[in-house]
Design a protein with these regions (language model features):
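Glycine-rich phosphate/cofactor-binding loops in nucleotide/flavin-utilizing enzymes
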Residues: 27, 127-184
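Hydrophobic, well-ordered secondary-structure elements that form the walls
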Residues: 44, 75, 85, 112, ...
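Alpha-helical scaffold segments that form or flank carboxylate-/histidine-based iron centers
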Residues: 66-78, 102-111, 139, 144
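Short, conserved micro-motifs enriched in small and acidic residues
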Residues: 31-38, 102-106, 110, 153-157
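C-terminal helix-coil-helix/basic helical segment that borders enzyme active sites and/or dimer interfaces
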Residues: 52, 56-63, 79-111, 124-129
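Glycine-rich beta->alpha junctions and the first turn(s) of the following alpha-helix
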Residues: 1-83, 148, 170-184
Length: 184
């Protein structure tokens, strides 16, 4: 590749884009993080639906699993996490469409992926031994949820490098203060 030339009109951003490829790539990561958050919401939805169906059909000690208070509590927590992440993802997507929300895209990815892990774990618990069997969809949802935390920036990298840094920068900005009049 030594001596390989590239004309300016082939460079992203033309001549103004020289040396900025990394920044162009990083700007594209926000969309990828939103897509990953959306995938996490899809996994949560599928796990919740499968759990509701299984809880209706599965009988334990003569009654449907759905009639046990602990099952209802698990399903309620699963639904709450799914709903919250879905609504947040929609809200942040609108902000991104308007040109903002870089840190927020990382936040929603963090929250949705972690929530997908929790929701699919609860789905596995509700399905018992059947949930762990590789041929069941719930087992696949659990595996899919785990890998989502790695896509588009590992959880720890996002938390430290993107979210914490953005929060720290915002906290350290001097607050705007009204100008003092000459008499005070």
């Amino acid at each position: 590749m030594d001596g390989l030339g590239l004309r300016c009109h082939h460079v992203g951003g033309e001549a103004g884009g020289l040396g900025k490829g990394f920044y162009f790539t990083m700007a594209g990561m926000m969309g990828g993080r939103m897509q990953t958050a959306a995938r996490a919401c899809g996994v949560m939805r599928a796990a919740l639906r499968a759990s509701l169906q299984y809880s209706r059909d599965r009988k334990v000690f003569g009654q449907p699993l759905l009639e046990y208070p602990l099952t209802l509590a698990k399903l309620a927590r699963m639904a709450a996490r799914f709903s919250a992440c879905r609504q947040l993802a929609f809200a942040i997507a609108r902000v991104l469409d308007e040109g903002g929300g870089r840190m927020e895209a990382s936040l929603v990815k963090l929250l949705a992926c972690r929530s997908a892990e929790m929701v699919t774990r609860e789905a596995l618990q509700l399905h018992g031994g059947m949930g762990y069997a590789e041929e069941t969809p719930v087992s696949r949802y659990f595996v899919d949820a785990r890998v989502l935390s790695i896509f588009e920036g590992a959880e720890e990298t996002l938390a430290l490098k993107v979210v914490a840094r953005s929060l720290l920068e915002a906290a350290l900005k001097p607050a705007s203060r009204p100008a003092l009049s000459a008499g005070t």
